[in-house]
Amino acid sequence: MNTNKLHKQINLIGERAQAASQIVSGLSIDERNKILLSFASEIEKNSDKIVEINVQELKEHRDDLSLPMQKRLQLSKEKISTIASSLKALVKLADPLSEGNTSWQAKAGFKVVKKTVPLGVVAMIYEARPNVTIDAAALTIKSANAVILRGGKESIKTNQVLVSILQQSLKKLGYSENIVQLIEDTSHDSVKELLHLRKFIDVLIPRGSGSFINYVVDNSTVPVIETGAGNDHIFVDKSADQEEAIKVIVNSKIQNPSVCNSAEKLLVHADIAKEFLPKLFDRLSNEGVEIRGDKEVQLIDNRVELAKDFDWDTEYNDLIIAVHLVNNLKEAIDWIGKHTTHHTEAILTNSAENASEFMQRIDAAVVTENASTRFTDGFEFGFGAEIGISTQKLHARGPMGLTALTSYKYEIFGHGEIRK
């Protein structure tokens, strides 16, 4: 598309979203929930159509995508049913605008009210996973925001049909279809345009690879919530229950290897490595996991491919794990500090002292003791769905549910008071 034409088109989308945000911010919680129930109903009614288009799109891109990535793009009837159920579950959650509201009397006599409000216009730029289209639309509407969606080229046809269904639902209920909008241009230019649409967008949330998110953070003039990559580590302390550790590591790696809360790196205390690693590698190899490691790990088991320097900072999103030996807790903490993406870091140990030090010193959005990294998830935390997992410290951190899509304002109620 002509650059000038694209600029005008995306500015128009931004302008419409800003106007729509004023509409949705005035809707009651009952009205917002009614929209979500309509979404659920229409998605289920149109499931055959969605699956047909999704299957066709997957065939077009199959040769260019890894198997885990294909799974992320797939929308089966079962997945659609799960999405519809999650929308109905979201309806049951409390109104985020009703939370955190407080008031007090100021010394000068007037009343101050701290009131929770929506952010306004939320823009989502994401790669792959078309279920993000529904999650983002539902969470933003529940929290009384408008949303602009820009998905990847691999799922553009699926996203088009999903957004069309959502917009039809809005129109049937008498609301503006501009509450949910999709940017259909999947070129790099459309991303650049969005990054500079500060006049209309209140916050931008990118989801995708580490390099993609870094590009957005480095180049956006719109405020960004960084949903960083997950180069997640598990440290197996020498006191760990080895059978339990194997169970947790296998779950963390293989349950869904293409997501950001999948374990990518394993640190093992050298004192237990010779006993522990062959048993673990048996399980991982049986599950099709490629094992990489340093020379010390190779000497223990010849199934290990020698890791390169880049491995220690790579989020694989695949059935690959890299293993490194450490001599003590301090070495593990220092290693993680050097290679972390501040997403999820875990320790497996029976030492309360070591667990406490690890939990205290590790700088990550989620730090886990004796549990799978896969629990870093808004649904698992009880937030309902999530719009992303923030790895920054401002404005939100960790799994972002409804309250992460709100801010607050102060209202003053006076009786003619003046400042002296």
Curated annotation (Swiss-Prot):
GO terms for cellular component: cytoplasm. It is found in: Cytoplasm. Pathway: Amino-acid biosynthesis; L-proline biosynthesis; L-glutamate 5-semialdehyde from L-glutamate: step 2/2. Its EC number is 1.2.1.41. It catalyses: L-glutamate 5-semialdehyde + phosphate + NADP(+) = L-glutamyl 5-phosphate + NADPH + H(+). The keyword Lyase does not apply. One of its GO terms (biological process) is L-proline biosynthetic process. Its main location: cytoplasm. Keywords: Amino-acid biosynthesis, Cytoplasm, NADP, Oxidoreductase, Proline biosynthesis. One of its GO terms (molecular function) is glutamate-5-semialdehyde dehydrogenase activity. The keyword Amino-acid biosynthesis applies. Gene3D superfamilies: Aldehyde Dehydrogenase, Chain A, domain 1, Aldehyde Dehydrogenase, Chain A, domain 2. It holds the Pfam family Aldedh. It comes from the Bacteria. Belongs to the gamma-glutamyl phosphate reductase family. Catalyzes the NADPH-dependent reduction of L-glutamate 5-phosphate into L-glutamate 5-semialdehyde and phosphate. The product spontaneously undergoes cyclization to form 1-pyrroline-5-carboxylate. This is Gamma-glutamyl phosphate reductase. It comes from Oenococcus oeni (strain ATCC BAA-331 / PSU-1). The lineage of its organism: Bacteria, Bacillati, Bacillota, Bacilli, Lactobacillales. The gene is proA.
